Swiss-Prot record:
Domain of life per record: Archaea
Residues forming coiled coils: none
The entry's keywords: 4Fe-4S, Iron, Iron-sulfur, Metal-binding, Repeat
Annotated [4Fe-4S] cluster binding sites: 9, 12, 15, 19, 75, 78, 81, 85, 107, 110, 113, 117, 146, 149, 152, 156, 177, 180, 183, 187, 216, 219, 222, 226, 245, 248, 251, 255, 284, 287, 290, 294, 324, 327, 330, 334, 365, 368, 371, 375
Protein name per UniProt: Polyferredoxin protein MvhB
4Fe-4S ferredoxin-type domain residues: 2-29, 30-57, 66-95, 96-127, 138-166, 168-197, 207-236, 237-265, 275-304, 311-344, 356-385, 386-412
Cofactor dependency: [4Fe-4S] cluster
InterPro entries membership: 3Fe4S_ferredoxin (IPR001080), 4Fe4S_Fe-S-bd (IPR017896), 4Fe4S_Fe_S_CS (IPR017900), Fe-S_Ferredoxin (IPR050572)
Single GO MF descriptor: iron ion binding
Cofactor note (record): Binds 10 [4Fe-4S] clusters.
A UniProt-annotated Pfam family: Fer4
Keyword 4Fe-4S: yes
Length: 412
């Protein structure tokens, strides 16, 4: 069975892209895959028609392992296998057509995922151990093995990142950096670490990745520059682009004839903070009580049923939680000084400590909207309220903590 080192996985999705049976699903928060239930697949046990079987396969070197085989002609689509699948990766294909293979999500041990992983964090039990990335993060801003793609540069809300040249390492101005962690979440190669922690990656969708064969001159610059080796040269003096990759864009940026076009949509940043109001996603039930009690709408919650708090508007979104982390990005671009980052005294574990809060003077605000544009989490907004024309910033009142019944919020 395959084994994935989820901790060091960069969530590029290449394994998902090459898996012929849909047995891997890569998400920002997790990697879900068929692990054959540790050697005793429950789907095989549950199948009443012997459509799923556990059979021997001989790997390179004569090593014998097990794989799952599937006989579509025996399958009656009863769904018993789907019900018992522990990771929830098995699914019946219901596309309205007579599908040739109506079941997806079982591992056939083809090893394509192992071969394609650019950092070798996918292995096979007893054959090849998944690689472990050993790094010592000893600085608040830590950069290692940066490929110089520059993807993080335009995402920085305070313009603290510069890239001298594509292919060279980025530089981060420690005086400007507000430790929001967006660069680390955006980095497709796990080269940036902020505040000593590994980030949860932002979602990344490749909307367009194409090659203009008429413009391609077969120079192989893209082949040589691709950090993961995803691009392959072809005999007709063009190249073959992958369906899924980290989408760093180095190939597009360094192509001398502009023959490559790449369009990537990044998902929203995740609030990151270890001081002030801290959110524990494991305890959160997305009930929205915190958002309803926040006096300044500095929290936005989407419930499992698609209701947004505050406001109760119905939206077509998955459950999510967004909170102002008092990162201070808004204060750095405010031209009038209406928004300021100030320190207040708070009690934390019996000790009095200084913590940041956002201070706002409406009389100085000219409603320019710079703060809204720069907010890393999209929580700030302009309002029609003359008394409070900007909302969404945390004043550290702690009412959200008092409202939460599940200990998902606390002050540190």
């Amino acid at each position: 069975m395959i084994v994935i080192n989820k901790e060091d996985c960069i969530r590029c999705g290449a394994c998902q892209g090459v898996c012929p049976t849909g047995a891997i699903s890569v998400k920002p928060e997790d990697v879900i895959y068929c692990d054959m239930c540790g050697g005793e697949p429950k789907c095989v046990e549950a199948c009443p028609n012997d459509a799923l079987r556990h059979e021997d396969i001989t790997l390179e070197g004569g090593i014998k392992k097990k794989k799952i085989t599937y006989s579509p002609e025996k399958c009656d689509k009863c769904g018993e296998c789907v019900k018992v699948c522990p990771p929830g990766i098995l699914k019946l294909v219901n596309d309205g057509k007579a599908s040739r293979v109506p079941l997806e999500g079982f591992c056939v041990l083809c090893q394509q995922c192992v071969n394609v992983c650019p950092i070798e964090v996918i292995g096979i039990e007893g054959v090849k151990e998944p690689a472990r990335v050993e790094i010592k993060i000893d600085k608040p801003i830590y950069i290692v093995d940066c490929v110089g793609c520059g993807l993080c540069v335009p995402e920085c809300p305070v313009n603290a990142i510069t890239l001298p040249k594509y292919g060279e390492s980025i530089e981060i101005d420690e005086e400007k950096c507000i430790k929001c962690g967006i660069c680390a979440q955006t980095c497709p190669w796990n080269s940036v670490y902020i505040s000593g922690k590994k980030p949860q990656k932002s979602s990344r969708t490749i909307e367009n990745f194409t090659l203009d064969k008429e413009e391609c001159i077969g120079c192989n610059t893209c082949v040589e520059i691709c950090p993961g080796g995803f691009i392959e040269p072809k005999s007709d003096l063009t190249v073959s682009l992958p369906e899924i990759c980290p989408a760093c864009g180095l190939c597009e940026k360094l192509c001398p004839t502009d023959a490559i076009e790449l369009e990537v949509k990044l998902g929203p940043a995740k609030p990151v903070t270890e001081e002030g109001i801290v959110y524990n996603d494991e305890n959160c039930k997305f009930c929205g009580r915190c958002a309803l009690n926040c006096p300044n709408e500095a929290i936005r919650v989407v419930s499992p049923k698609g209701r947004v708090f505050p406001g109760l508007k119905k939206v077509d979104e998955k459950e999510s939680y967004t909170i102002c982390t008092t990162c201070g990005a808004c204060t750095t671009v405010c031209p009038t000084g209406a928004l300021k980052l100030v320190e207040v005294s708070k009690k934390v574990n019996g000790e009095t400590v200084k913590r940041n809060r956002i201070q706002y003077n409406p009389s100085l605000c000219d409603k320019c909207g710079n703060c809204v544009d720069v907010c890393p989490y999209g929580i700030l907004k302009l309002t029609d309220d003359e008394k409070l024309p900007v909302k969404g910033f945390c004043i550290l009142c702690e009412k959200c903590i008092d409202a939460c019944r599940f200990n998902a919020l606390l002050i540190k």
